Amino acid sequence: MVDLVDHKKICSRVFVVGYPIHHSKSPKIHKFWLKYYGLQGESVSEEVTVREFSNFIASIKKGNFLGGNVTSPHKQEAFRLADYKDGIATAIGAANTLWIEGKKLLATNSDAYGFSANLDDFVPGWAGETALVFGAGGAARAIIYALKKRKFERIFLFNRTKKNADDLAEYFGKSTIKVYDWCSSCEKARQADLIVNTTSMDMINFSERENGAFFDFHKTKPTALVTDVVYTPLITPFLQQAKAHGLKTVNGLGMLLHQAVPGFEKWFGVRPSVTKELRAAILEDMGENRG
């Protein structure tokens, strides 16, 4: 017979799943909120390969978890395997937040919300007509959705595998999204109001041209806003270069913090706040001295 306390603990568990997953700060965020709001629960990391992911999803439906967050490389597969996808997840074509209702697995995507809320915190009223987006994975999908919601008229998309970028443009509509080769990103930067890196690579070292690094911030207009969804390190080489050219930058930590809000509310019934105390706790865990 299962002990009642143990059963309650099991049913209050949430996860963050990805591969690799050791870098994720999501469990730290969840644990901070659980303690702050006086809630019972547990957040765990689950490192699951692509091959094992469908079995992991099947285990969720057995009631082992309330739900959880999904990170790379599983967001599109999580969307596919969910029993029900809300309108946001369907529009994006990927899911990062899962929860159980009855015996059904439900999915949404909070990355677009997290991206916009992060910029709202640091650059209130941010807007523009033209954006450059590097990458064509799950994060790029959410950011394109967010930019379209903010009425950006042109989104220039760059990805090392051009076919993936072409597929993304087809999904969201080629009237707004234009795909270009990496080497043309510098010229397109002249038009950009917003430049977003969604890749996990060190872009400065990824692709060298004869005349230097593949992206040259010298050609970016001085009013452009530059952001990176990567948050480890907090100031990525991409952001370092932008700062060196006097451009306004926003790091990716806030996107991580804000995207965690909707899921936590669904699992535990409390809508948490992204506070200075939370940010400081995660920065301390990262070994950063910034406030």
Curated annotation (Swiss-Prot):
Record-linked CDD domains: NAD_bind_Shikimate_DH
EC number: 1.1.1.25
Pathway this chain belongs to: Metabolic intermediate biosynthesis; chorismate biosynthesis; chorismate from D-erythrose 4-phosphate and phosphoenolpyruvate: step 4/7
Binding positions for shikimate per the UniProt entry: S24, K25, S26, T71, N96, D111, Y231
Active site: K75
A GO cellular component annotation in the UniProt record: cytosol
Binding site for NADP(+): G135, A136, G137, G138, A139, V229, G252
InterPro entries (UniProt xref): Aminoacid_DH-like_N_sf, NAD(P)-bd_dom_sf, SDH_C, Shikimate_DH, Shikimate_DH-bd_N, Shikimate_DH_fam, Shikm_DH/Glu-tRNA_Rdtase
Annotated TM spans: none
GO molecular function (one): NADP binding
Record's keyword terms, sorted: Amino-acid biosynthesis, Aromatic amino acid biosynthesis, NADP, Oxidoreductase
Catalysed transformations (reactions): shikimate + NADP(+) = 3-dehydroshikimate + NADPH + H(+)
Subunit composition and interactions: Homodimer.
Functional note: Involved in the biosynthesis of the chorismate, which leads to the biosynthesis of aromatic amino acids. Catalyzes the reversible NADPH linked reduction of 3-dehydroshikimate (DHSA) to yield shikimate (SA).
Record-stated family: Belongs to the shikimate dehydrogenase family.
Protein name as it appears in the record: Shikimate dehydrogenase (NADP(+))
Organism: Bartonella bacilliformis (strain ATCC 35685 / KC583 / Herrer 020/F12,63)
Taxonomic lineage of the native organism: Bacteria, Pseudomonadati, Pseudomonadota, Alphaproteobacteria, Hyphomicrobiales
